[in-house]
Amino acid sequence: PSMFYEKVLHKKPLKISNKPSVLKHSMSLFVIYFSTKKIYDHIQHHTIIFNKRHKELLKDIFDKKVMIDDPSLYLHRPMATDGKGQQFESDSFYVLAPVPNNSSNINWNDYGDKFKNIVFDILEDYALPGLKKSLVDSFYITPNYFEDELNTYAGSGFGIQPIFRQSAYFRYSNKAPEFNNLYFVGASTHPGAGVPGVISTAKATEKLILKDYGIS
């Protein structure tokens, strides 16, 4: 809803608490998809590499919104469960790093390649030895992708933050109060984020539409 109000409607929501610039939006993500000619059998389906200064890192991402050079990482290796890549003697992954959203004004066009190398260095040191020599192909997406292609506000990865004053009733309503025929679903909409929350928003919005249009 934040992006829709700002970019499509070009107006502010009636509820001042739902003004996009007032709301706290979630972090964004830097995601690298890559394949290797080496099979890393010791890596499970899900791996998390925590930064040693975890609390300070969160402050840099959420509060200071500054560029980081020591991210925590989530590594996803589907081959650990699927196994089909082994017949081709290759492996595939994606790795994501939480980063500030685009309200930080970080120029990802300039910094993207450097940050990719930082991530690969961490992976090589802590999880995937010999990674750089084993790389077959890779590409990455930045907060710009979330903002420009997925139309998320400031490139946020998960909508508005699920803090108390932005939870449940305080999130965007399922029906826009300014219009009789505008409805919302999604992570930033009541009742909340996450897959169960998003499904719940769809069910709640469906009930509103059926009621408004007299459909039983």
Predicted features and spans:
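Conserved FAD/dinucleotide-binding core of flavoprotein oxidoreductases
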Residues: 2-6, 35, 87-122
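Hydrophobic, well-ordered secondary-structure elements that form the walls
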Residues: 34, 95, 123, 182, ...
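Flavin-binding catalytic cores
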Residues: 39, 66-68, 108-148
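A glycine-rich dinucleotide-binding beta-alpha-beta segment and adjacent secondary-structure elements
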Residues: 74, 129-191
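A conserved FAD-binding loop/helix module that cradles the flavin
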Residues: 187-209
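Active-site-proximal substrate-binding core of FAD-dependent oxidoreductases
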Residues: 211-216
